[in-house]
Regions:
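Mid-domain alpha/beta scaffold segments of enzyme catalytic cores
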Residues: 1-257
Length: 257
């Protein structure tokens, strides 16, 4: 009963193979999946998929690499799509200083606006941050986190940074990057954070975990992330799966449904 809290079954790489991917995931114990739409094509495809499969949920937002195209019309579009009954969060939103497809000031403005929308809609928000941890932290700190909290997606910082985000009301989600040999800082965070503050994800088709590193990632491979973190923490994979799934269901508001 593993919950992949962040996957992109809605991208072109998986077109025509979604049934196969979902079946493989189920076979490997990944029984719930959150499909993240980050621009109009991926949002539309995500909504089509969640209407077809009971075990799929959807997160909708405007990715920081798309911040330059954020307009009032886009915001109206998002607000309309966020009404879908299987929407569990707003995202992925944040800052991306690696690609820098929009100026920092524009990314910050769009990030702040979407945090506010998430609070207005009583939804948790999912954060993408790349080469921008400090600014991401300061924006979340100044905007505040709503009662539903937020998720640091595919976390790649230190334990110290993870604890700072947790103190703001965020939960830390670990992807296949935690399995990489040189990811010792991320591994320390996955080992030491309180159990109720961690989630697991794939970010498929990106960032495949060991032993599949370098290949196309699959939502089924959440199993390898669970196995790795469970070993780090000295617990069984089943125990970690139960806890992280319960965490996801609580944050996404599925525990009361």
């Amino acid at each position: 009963m593993i919950f992949d809290t962040h996957t992109h079954l809605n991208v072109e790489e998986f077109a025509g193979r979604e049934v196969e991917e979902i079946a493989l995931a189920t076979e490997m114990g990944v029984t719930q999946m959150n499909i993240v739409g980050f621009d109009q094509p991926t949002i539309e495809r995500a909504l089509e998929l969640v209407d077809e499969y009971d075990q799929l949920y959807v997160t909708i937002g405007w990715h920081p690499t798309e911040a330059g195209s954020y307009t009032e019309e886009i915001e109206d579009y998002l607000l309309d799509k966020l009404k879908h009954p299987k929407v569990v969060a707003l995202g992925e939103i944040g800052l991306d200083y690696h690609w820098m497809t929009a100026p920092k000031e524009v990314q910050e403005q769009v990030f702040r606006r979407q945090i506010q929308l998430s609070k207005d809609l009583d939804l948790p928000f999912v954060v993408h941050t790349r080469d921008a941890l400090e600014d991401t932290y300061e924006i979340i700190k100044s905007e505040g986190v709503g009662p539903r909290g937020g998720i640091m997606h595919s976390f790649s910082g230190t334990l110290e940074w993870a604890e700072k985000f947790v103190a703001l009301g965020m939960t830390i989600s670990f992807s296949g990057v935690v399995t990489f040999k040189k990811a010792t800082d991320i591994q320390e965070a996955a080992k030491e954070l309180p159990l109720d503050k961690i989630l697991v994800e794939t970010d498929a088709p990106y960032l495949a975990p060991v032993p599949k590193r370098g290949r196309e990632n699959k939502t089924a491979y959440t199993r390898y992330v669970v196995d790795f973190i469970a070993d780090l923490r000295g617990m069984t994979a089943e125990e970690l799966a139960v806890v992280t799934t319960a965490n996801a269901e609580r944050i996404f508001g599925l525990d009361s449904k």
